[in-house]
Amino acid sequence: MDFGIGFLSNNVMLPILDFFYGIVPSYGLAIVALTLVVRFAVYPLSAGSIRNMRRMKVVQPIMQKRMQEIQQKYKDNPAEQQKAMAEVYREFGNPLAGCFPLLLQLPILFALFATLRGSPFADVNYQINLQIVPPDQPVLAQPFATKPQNIYVDEGVHFPIQAVVPSGTRIPVGQMVDLQFQTKEGKPFSELVAAYPNSHLQPKWQIIRGQERATIDREGHLQALQPGEVTVQGTIPGIAADKGFLFISALGHVGVIDQGELFITLPDGARQFNWGAIHWDILVMILGFGVSLYVNQLLSGQGSSNNPQQQTVNQLTPIIFSGMFLFFPLPAGVLLYMLIANIFQTVQTFILQREPLPENLQKLVEEQERAEAIKNRAPLPFEGKGAKGAKATKAKGNPSS
């Protein structure tokens, strides 16, 4: 039994999705509601990570200085060095403490991601590797079935469906076999669809590797032609793949540009760029994701660094992450989830950044601000050239004065 991502998706995410769709029959609203439910559920975990990151940003300069002093002082005594470092972590906290809440919420977020990449929002693919063998080679018929995937056959109705090769994956040249979809109990997928008049799902089959070794029609009738390896892909459409939501034309559409329609041929033979091939709804969501990522960086302080190289990397991170979706496209429904989740986290970061720090850390912040103010203040006319530096040194040495 699967107790991993698939278990969370099938037994947690899909029931929540069906619940909200039952209230308001819109898969777009169901995505929004499911995303918010999950983000509120992991709010305490993500809040712990954000708070720890904020604390570490405050104490990092002091911790680094303390660590360097300890390493220098106990360089010949590893046991004392480790003991002294443990005292520093006990006083200021462990930088790795914020990773644990993040790790706890990852399976939940991955399950949500996997749910939105499958049925009903996107087409579901099944791949089968076949071995075409010579006609005189003996073959033992052993039925083969892929791992089942949840398929929506109607609104709110889904079943685990697997692709099946009744005669097995070793097929003699000249033989014809029927590849089919069915439930784990053996009920044909076509019978399931026939039981729901509103469902018009039409699965299709195609060969994606070894086209010269076999042929197959859309219904799954495969004819073996010559020995070798063949990879067959069966696809079941998502019932909500062509459904729109707000400014999104189709929740299941993948990619910003329709590659085959990027240029059109005019009556005079000239080729012209086809602006209609660009899906502006997906482009807007990708740009929104990048902007929210950048704002989140600014709020959390991750975008600021004294190291110019690190500063450049931080500034480029939102661009790199957003650009990835141009080359590794995702369905529009998944992008909608990512945009909403990122906006939610940005608002969460904004709220948590305004929480008061613990008293000991607040004193450190005030001391750093006071020292920085003295350092950046222009000297008064009656002060000598060294007066400013002397006062800054005094402020660092005696912050309470």
From Swiss-Prot:
Keyword annotations for this protein, in alphabetical order, are: Cell inner membrane, Cell membrane, Chaperone, Membrane, Protein transport, Transmembrane, Transmembrane helix, Transport
How is the protein disposed in the membrane?
A: Multi-pass membrane protein
Listed Pfam families = 60KD_IMP
List where Low complexity composition bias occurs: 389-401
Q: Which family does it belong to?
A: Belongs to the OXA1/ALB3/YidC family. Type 1 subfamily.
Q: What is this protein called?
A: Membrane protein insertase YidC
Instruction: Give the UniProt entry's GO cellular component terms.
Output: plasma membrane
Per the UniProt record, which residue ranges are transmembrane? 12-32, 96-116, 275-295, 319-339
Cite the GO molecular-function annotations of the record.
membrane insertase activity
The task this protein performs is described as: Required for the insertion and/or proper folding and/or complex formation of integral membrane proteins into the membrane. Involved in integration of membrane proteins that insert both dependently and independently of the Sec translocase complex, as well as at least some lipoproteins. Aids folding of multispanning membrane proteins.
Q: Where is this region: Disordered?
A: 375-401
Leader sequence range is none
Q: Biological process GO terms, please?
A: protein insertion into membrane; protein transport
Q: What is its main location?
A: membrane
Query: Quaternary arrangement and interactors, per the entry?
Result: Interacts with the Sec translocase complex via SecD. Specifically interacts with transmembrane segments of nascent integral membrane proteins during membrane integration.
Q: Where in or outside the cell is it found?
A: Cell inner membrane
